[in-house]
């Protein structure tokens, strides 16, 4: 199937431009059963480049690199997730474990012990109440007091809490090797979980497959092709935020050839400084130009795809204001 797409301000714009605006617009070939509508705003040349790279066997599918799943659902973060002040108030130092509760708490492409300690000092909610799957009578006095405080607030009556055998115990599965941003503003990102913290469902958790170097994956994730592709996979709503469910994150593709040449620390430093252009210039030169032999024009085309689609959804955010 082919389609023409014309963007107009309003009906008066259509009247002023007339039928010629349609006649002068190129046809685009799209698979309407699979392709999302956002691809309609790309040129035929851009679509062809994406299609070619999406079928390039030299680029790795996410499912060959990692598993991804939703973060922990507590049922009541106001009870289970707390800051240092609450830990000290209820004397729960032996009853909490590290957790990341918001994507804003992650600045680079790795969560280090230093990062976590800085979050504690800033008063962020990075402690998770984990008394264990014990009968109430077997808990410590401090744990009992905190649970009773929570019941006084009615937290135990929330749906996710009341359907548990013990409302104050949240089951935990595997510990994440890394996190993926679930709701991205400018672009998605993978963050290595060096602190071995839990994560709430505001982010996704990642477990690397056997023999996969997670540092290489996190470093290679930030390249212009992967960011351009992500704009066609995620869902954007009125606020301009790009949202990914685990299924969409499994469709991500990452050029991993020569990823062992990337300097993770350099990428992390630039990311923390907000210098994504430096990151992409660096990673593209190795992953796209040197490894995949893409031309300067093709890399510029990928950058155009990413910026065009990112700017489009961000403009909707500004219109909402």
Question: Could you say what each language-model-derived stretch is?
Answer:
Residues 1-42:
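Internal, well-ordered domain-core segments that constitute the primary functional module
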Residues 2, 100, 310-314:
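Intrinsically disordered, low-complexity sequence elements enriched in Ser/Thr/Gly/Pro
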Residues 3-7, 178, 254, 280-281:
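Generic low-polarity alpha-helical segments
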Residues 8, 14-15, 23, 246, ...:
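S-adenosyl-L-methionine
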Residues 14, 202, 276:
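Short, mixed-charge aromatic SLiMs
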Residues 22, 32-37, 41-80, 142, ...:
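Non-catalytic DNA-recognition/assembly elements of restriction-modification systems
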Residues 38, 46-269:
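Polybasic, glycine- and aromatic-enriched phosphate-binding surface used to engage nucleic acids
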């Amino acid at each position: 199937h082919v389609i023409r797409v014309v963007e107009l301000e309003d009906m008066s714009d259509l009247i002023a431009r007339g039928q010629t605006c349609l006649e002068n617009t190129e046809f685009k070939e799209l698979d309407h059963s699979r392709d999302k509508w956002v691809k309609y705003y790309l040129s035929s040349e851009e679509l062809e480049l994406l299609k070619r790279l999406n079928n390039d066997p030299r680029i790795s599918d996410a499912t060959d690199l990692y598993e991804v799943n939703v973060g922990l659902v507590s049922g009541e973060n106001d009870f289970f997730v707390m800051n240092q002040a609450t830990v000290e108030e209820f004397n729960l130092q032996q009853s909490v474990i590290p957790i990341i509760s918001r994507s804003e708490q992650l600045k680079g492409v790795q969560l280090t012990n230093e990062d976590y300690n800085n979050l504690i000092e800033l008063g962020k909610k990075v402690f998770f109440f984990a008394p264990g799957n014990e009968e109430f009578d077997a808990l410590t006095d401090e744990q009992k007091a905190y649970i009773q405080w929570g019941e006084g607030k009615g937290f135990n009556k929330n749906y996710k809490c009341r359907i548990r055998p013990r409302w104050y115990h949240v089951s935990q599965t595997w510990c994440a090797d890394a996190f993926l941003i679930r709701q991205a503003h400018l672009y998605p990102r993978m963050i290595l979980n060096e602190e071995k913290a839990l994560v709430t469902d505001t982010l996704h958790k990642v477990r690397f497959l056997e023999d996969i170097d997670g540092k290489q994956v996190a470093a290679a994730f930030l390249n212009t092709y992967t960011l351009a592709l992500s704009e066609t996979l995620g869902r954007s709503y009125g606020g301009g935020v790009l949202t990914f469910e685990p299924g969409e994150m499994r469709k991500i593709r990452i050029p991993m050839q020569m990823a062992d040449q990337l300097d993770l620390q350099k990428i992390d430093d630039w990311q923390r400084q907000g210098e994504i252009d430096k990151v992409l210039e660096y990673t593209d030169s190795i992953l796209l130009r040197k490894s995949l032999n893409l031309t300067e024009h093709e890399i510029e085309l990928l950058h155009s795809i990413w910026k065009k689609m990112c700017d489009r959804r961000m403009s909707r955010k500004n219109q909402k204001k």
